[in-house]
Every structure is written in structure tokens, then in C-alpha cells.
């Protein structure tokens, strides 16, 4: 289905061209990182829609849906920004149930959501499969941290200064804008623009 052409959609079509020029066939993961309230989830949703416009198999997920429960996080110490930055997302769960099985292709099933952050509760997993050629658009804070960034085929960062304490810790350790292939300025969400690229 063709999307209505707006300045945002036209820009994201250019981003999609760039993404597709950087990848080959098979299973591909595009990761979008950025500070809290930067619009990364909406960007991921919109980019996925633009990629689907080209009749590509596209899946969406957010690292927010792979959190540790508050009880599990408490095992790592008091509720601080550092604890959240280090242990808020269950990276092992993300890998085991989404990233690794998605990469395996074939009939291997994966889940795009495992945890409800608002309810602080696990969700019933919905296992899905996809074709051999498919794109996963994954958004979330801290995805371009050093220990995760090599898992992604294309890394996108939303431009913006961190205002949250956990984001400030993450950016002090590794600014996602410095390692992303594509950096997007969404200060005007209806008229996003490139802020940089590698």
C-alpha cells in the first residue's frame, strides 16, 4: 500500500533507500537508538511502514518490551539510573527470543514482545516466523552500546541531547550518534532531516 506523500514520508523513503543500499539478502536488523522522548519509536514505526511500501517483509519490535521486571532489577541493587542503564533491559531475553531466532530464518519462530513495562508483567508470547528475506526494525534506548552494536546490520541514531540520568550515563560511555551509520534530527517531527552519516 502506497503511503500518502508528506515531507516526513518523502524523507523516510530516502532513509529506506540508504538502509537498503547497505544490506544484502537474508535477515536484516535495523536498530534505532536515541534518548528518552526523542521519537525513536515513532521513527521506527514510520520507517517500517515505508519499507513495507516496497513489498518487503518487515517486523517491528522495541527493546522496551524486553525489560526485566522491577523485582528482577532489584537483585542488582537500589533503584538508580545506573542500575536501569546496566540492567533495565534483559539483553539475554532479547537475544534468546528475538535476535538469535530471527537471524536463524527458516521455520525458527521468534517473539517481538515479551514483557509489559506498564503492568510490570510478562505477556503471553506470540511466536511468529517470516520469510528468508526479512527486515526487523528494532528501537530502544542503549541499543548502540558497545556490547550490543555489532548485532545490528544498520544502526540509526536519533539526534538529541540526553536529559534523563540513565541516558546521560549511556551517552558518556558511548554516544550513539558517533557510531550510527545514519543520524536523524527530528527536532521538527514533520520535517526530519539528516544530521550526519558514516
Located regions from the model:
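Extreme N-terminal, non-catalytic leader segments
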Residues: 1-30
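Conserved nucleotide-sensing/catalytic segment adjacent to the nucleotide-binding pocket
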Residues: 59-62, 68-119, 135
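Hydrophobic positions on the alpha1 helix immediately C-terminal to the Walker A/P-loop
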Residues: 43
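Post-Walker A helix-loop "phosphate-sensing" segment adjacent to the P-loop in P-loop NTPases
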Residues: 49-59
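Active-site signature of alpha/beta-hydrolase-fold catalytic machinery across serine-
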Residues: 46
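P-loop (Walker A) phosphate-binding loop of NTP-binding proteins
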Residues: 35
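Conserved glycine(s) of the Walker
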Residues: 39
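Conserved NTP phosphate-binding and transfer environment spanning the P-loop NTPase/kinase superfamily
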Residues: 2-12, 142-198
Amino acid at each position: 500500500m502506497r503511503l500518502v506523500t508528506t515531507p516526513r514520508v518523502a524523507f523516510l523513503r530516502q532513509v529506506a533507500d540508504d538502509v537498503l543500499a547497505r544490506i544484502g539478502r537474508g535477515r536484516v536488523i535495523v536498530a534505532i537508538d536515541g534518548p528518552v522522548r526523542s521519537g525513536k519509536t515513532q521513527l521506527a514505526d514510520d520507517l517500517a511502514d515505508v519499507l513495507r511500501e516496497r513489498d518487503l517483509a518487515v517486523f517491528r519490535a522495541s527493546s522496551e518490551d524486553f525489560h526485566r521486571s522491577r523485582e528482577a532489577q532489584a537483585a542488582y541493587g537500589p533503584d538508580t539510573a545506573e542500575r536501569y542503564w546496566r540492567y533495565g533491559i534483559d539483553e539475554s531475553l532479547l537475544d534468546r527470543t528475538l535476535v538469535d531466532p530471527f537471524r536463524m530464518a527458516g521455520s525458527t519462530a521468534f517473539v517481538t514482545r515479551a514483557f509489559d513495562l506498564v503492568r510490570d508483567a510478562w505477556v503471553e508470547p506470540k511466536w511468529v516466523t517470516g520469510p528468508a528475506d526479512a527486515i526487523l526494525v528494532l528501537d530502544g534506548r542503549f541499543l548502540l552500546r558497545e556490547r550490543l552494536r555489532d548485532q545490528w546490520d544498520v544502526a540509526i541514531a536519533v539526534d538529541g541531547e540526553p536529559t534523563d540520568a540513565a541516558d546521560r550515563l549511556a551517552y558518556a560511555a558511548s554516544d550513539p550518534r558517533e557510531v550510527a551509520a545514519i543520524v536523524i534530527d527530528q527536532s521538527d517531527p514533520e520535517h526530519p532531516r539528516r544530521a550526519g552519516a558514516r
